[in-house]
Each structure stands twice: as structure tokens, then as C-alpha cells.
Amino acid sequence: MKKKIFTESKNGYFGEAKGGNHAFGGQYIPEILLPALKELEKAYHGVFVSKAYKKELKSLFKHFVGRPTPLIYAHNASKILKNDIYLKFEGLANTGAHKINNALGQVLLAKHMKKKRVIAETGAGQHGLATAAACARLGLECEIFMGEIDIARQRPNVFNMELFGAKVHSVSSGSKTLKDAVNEALREWSKRSDDSFYVLGSALGPYPYPDIVRDLQSVISKELKKQTKAYFSSLPDILVACVGGGSNAMGFFTHYLKEERVRLIGVEAGGIGDKEGENAIRINTINASEGIAQGYKSLFLQDKDGQLSDTHSISAGLDYAGIGPQLAHLYEVGRVEFQSATDKEALEALSFFAQYEGIIPALESSHALAAVIRLCKDIKGKKIIANISGRGDKDIFITAKALTPEHWKTFLSEEIARIG
């Protein structure tokens, strides 16, 4: 019997058995946060679908974000790779990534709910940046929680968050990365849920967050369906997106979930090896298992006691130990395929598309592009669309060190001397 594809959750779960095996999602949170989540549920089914909210969000998407973002035909890459390669360029949205779609929608919802302060976690800094920008535009206080390691490797985004007026909290507990920032943000929300709104950055967490984030990010695939008609009359053959928590992938895939002839491929962080702690692969690995963490049930990299494992990726946005519940479900029912790309492959893909297409994709998006290059070794004449979820400006402290270490070291030394 064909397995049912859940395009939205039912009773908070994606999957046939509510809360049991083969069902992901749910609402596993401390009792103190239940009133806040019930309030959010009410807003999701009320304000979120109201004409007034939708009209204001549509206007902000156009006049503040700069939507629609373009669909670009990669002429040179297409010739070299012998397939028609298209790029949905979310990096040209305000703040440089797809994260603004979700952050702006949630901050606007917070304003309609009469909240005064916004809390958010961030890994690569793009969600924090987008949330800070949305708060600046809509006039709400903003506090961002970010791992100490991520702050060090994403300093440009931290500077810009603070420029937008946000207070950035450095999280020094645990692995000092995204999973620890999420924990701290949840703790803070539990203290002040009465006047604060938690803007969750990916399509995960307790219900209704996975649905809210998917709905807001699905503007990507909604636009894409219209844009492809200008290029070709048929459907694309393959869609490829990187997967950290899953927000850009769900936004990119949503309007194609029922188009079964379109292959949907998610690309995880292959890091530097296959051992535990050397990557962030949650699918097709013996290191991941079903579990409950940070408010939801899904597939996690975790130890035998259920503690989230350390991960690695050159990309700060892909090193999360869990995966969104809807993507876990879509993998289980066979609708979304998963691959991985190593740090090395991502850097090579970044260099390839920079050289031949004049774009600098974010390291996250470069993982998707690495998978595109690999796919093209075995297929020809297909229409392949990759989601460029963000620009690579934010990654200069990583990419410059990795690609031109001596030049970068010389530049930094000279700059320090000038400042001194």
C-alpha cells in the first residue's frame, strides 16, 4: 500500500501513528511553556490566516524583502555539466538569505499578538540577522542566542545584528554551537513568555513551529512554479536543497510534494569523515536514531542516553544534530532522497560556481551545488534546480582561510598593523 505523504501536520504530527513509531513532530515541552504554545496555536489558526496579516506580509515581502527572488539559468555550468542547471537565488533577498521569509513572518505575527520582545537562536547567523532586521523594521526589541564557536566564525553577521539593535548573547555551554543556542533560547522564553515571542529559525521544534516555518518559507516554491513556466513548459526533473534543520528545503519542496515525477533531493553535511562527530548526517547513517529533543520527535545524532552528539561541518548552518519532523517523515515515505557532501566538495562547488557563474553561494548552499555536480556525472539533459539559500559574504572568515590561507593571513596581519 502506498504510504500517505503529509503536506502538513495532523494533531501536531507528520505520520500515521500519532506519537508512536513512524510519526514525527509533537509537542514535548516543559509545562511552563504550554500556555505560550497554546497562545501561538491560536494565533496560527487565527491571525496567521487572516486577510489583514496576509496583506501586510505580502507587502513586506515585496517592498522590504525584495521578492520575488530570481530564477537564474546557469549558462556556463549547464554547458560543462551537460544538464540544464537553474538557481533559485534566495541570496538576493534582503539580509542575504531565505531566513528573512520566516523571521519577518514570525516577527509580524508577534506584533499582531502584542508582544514587545523577540527571542531567537542562530547558528550561521542568518536567522539572527533576519530576525534583527525584521525587529528593526517592525519596532520590537530583539535578543539573539548564538554559540560561542559560531560567533567566532560568523563575526560579520554578529556585527550586523548588533547594528540592527539586537542584543547578542554568547552561549558557552556544551558544544557552543546551534543546539546549545536553542536550549538557551528556550530557557529564556520559559522565563518571559508573557511579553516575549520565540522566533524559531527552522522547520522543527514543538508544534506549531514546523508548520509555521514551512508555510512562511513555501513562498520559495510558490514563486518557483510560476517562474519555471517562463523557462520551460514542463516540470523540472530534479530539485536540490541543502538540509540543516530543514527550512530552506521545505520551502523549496512544498509545492512539488504532490508532483511525484519531480525528484526531491536534500543534501546534508558530510563534514570530514564518517565517524561520530565528524559530520552532521542524520539520514542513512547508523549514528542517528529516533528520539525526542528540543520539543519534538525526529531523527537525531544522539548517544545511548539520548544526549545530542557533537557534530561537524564547515558550514555553521548545517551542523545541527536533528532534522525537522516533516523531512524525517518525507524520507520515511520515500518522497525525499538524501545525500551528503563533504567540506571539501562544498568548497570545490563554491569555487566552480564562482568561477563559471559569477556567484558566491553560502557554504550551506554549496553543499547542494556539490550534489548537483555529482548528479551530473551520471545523467544528461535533465532540468535541475538548486536552491541558493544564501550568499557567501558571511563566510569570508572560513572560505578565505580555506581557499587562500597565505593571502588571508597576510591581509589580516596587515589590517591588524593598520589598526594598531
Curated annotation (Swiss-Prot):
Q: Name one GO molecular function term.
A: tryptophan synthase activity
EC number(s) on file: 4.2.1.20
**Cofactor(s) listed in the protein's UniProt record:** pyridoxal 5'-phosphate
N6-(pyridoxal phosphate)lysine-modified residues are 99
Q: What is this enzyme's catalytic activity, as reactions?
A: (1S,2R)-1-C-(indol-3-yl)glycerol 3-phosphate + L-serine = D-glyceraldehyde 3-phosphate + L-tryptophan + H2O
- One Pfam family of this protein, by short name? PALP
Pathway of this protein? Amino-acid biosynthesis; L-tryptophan biosynthesis; L-tryptophan from chorismate: step 5/5
Task: Please give an example of a GO cellular component term from this record.
Answer: cytoplasm
The protein's superkingdom reads Bacteria
Key words of the record: Amino-acid biosynthesis, Aromatic amino acid biosynthesis, Lyase, Pyridoxal phosphate, Tryptophan biosynthesis
NCBIfam families linked? trpB
What biological function has been recorded for the protein in this entry?
A: The beta subunit is responsible for the synthesis of L-tryptophan from indole and L-serine.
Under the subunit heading, UniProt states: Tetramer of two alpha and two beta chains.
What the record says about family reads: Belongs to the TrpB family.
Protein name in the entry: Tryptophan synthase beta chain
Q: Which organism is it from?
A: Helicobacter hepaticus (strain ATCC 51449 / 3B1)
Q: What phylogenetic lineage does the species belong to?
A: Bacteria, Pseudomonadati, Campylobacterota, Epsilonproteobacteria, Campylobacterales
Gene of this entry:
trpB
